[in-house]
Amino acid sequence: MDPEYSELFERLNKQLDNVEDVLKPLKDAESIFELAEGKSELEQAKLYITMSYAINSTLYSFYKLNGIDASERPVMQELQRVKNYISKIQQAEKNVNPKTEAVNTSNAAISSSSSNRPKVAKDAATRIIKHHT
């Protein structure tokens, strides 16, 4: 076998091992809700949107590998919707953990910044996951 190919196969094998390690909690859990247990609402939203992205990007890859024009499929709308949610989650993270806040802020500043934090739409995130499972 060509040494270049053997190196590629070796890298692929290592990457697949990494994927297996990452997916092990999914395999062991009985439901996605079990995975979300004990996490903050923001972490739950990130979990749900990551799962949705993984499912939709896998479907997109399936279409591309089989020569199907994915641009006309609903998966493209779903991927765009997921991208929008990712942006919203990133914005929520910035609002929850603002890096510009000084370490020694007063209690008034802390309480006013926490009242401006956006709420994570837990019901919406749950509906997204139910729709894709």
Curated annotation (Swiss-Prot):
Give the region (Disordered) as residue ranges. Answer: 96-133
- One cellular component GO annotation, for this chain's record? nucleus
- Tell me which UniProt keywords the record has, alphabetically: Cytoplasm, Exosome, Nucleus, RNA-binding, rRNA processing
Q: Which GO terms describe its molecular function?
A: DNA binding; RNA binding
Q: Which Pfam families match?
A: Sas10_Utp3
Is Cytoplasm there in the keyword field? Answer: yes
**Subcellular localization(s) per the UniProt record:** Cytoplasm; Nucleus
What is any one GO biological process for this UniProt entry?
Answer: maturation of 5.8S rRNA
> Where does this protein have compositionally biased stretches of type Low complexity?
102-116
Q: Please give the chief subcellular localization of this protein.
A: cytoplasm
Q: Which InterPro entries match?
A: Exosome-assoc_fac/DNA_repair, Sas10/Utp3/C1D
Q: How does it assemble?
A: Component of the exosome multienzyme ribonuclease complex. Interacts with cut3.
**What biological function has been recorded for the protein in this entry?**
Required for exosome-dependent processing of pre-rRNA and small nucleolar RNA (snRNA) precursors. Involved in processing of 35S pre-rRNA at the A0, A1 and A2 sites.
Query: What family does the entry list?
Result: Belongs to the C1D family.
Q: What is this protein called?
A: Exosome complex protein C1739.07
Organism in which the protein naturally occurs? Schizosaccharomyces pombe (strain 972 / ATCC 24843)
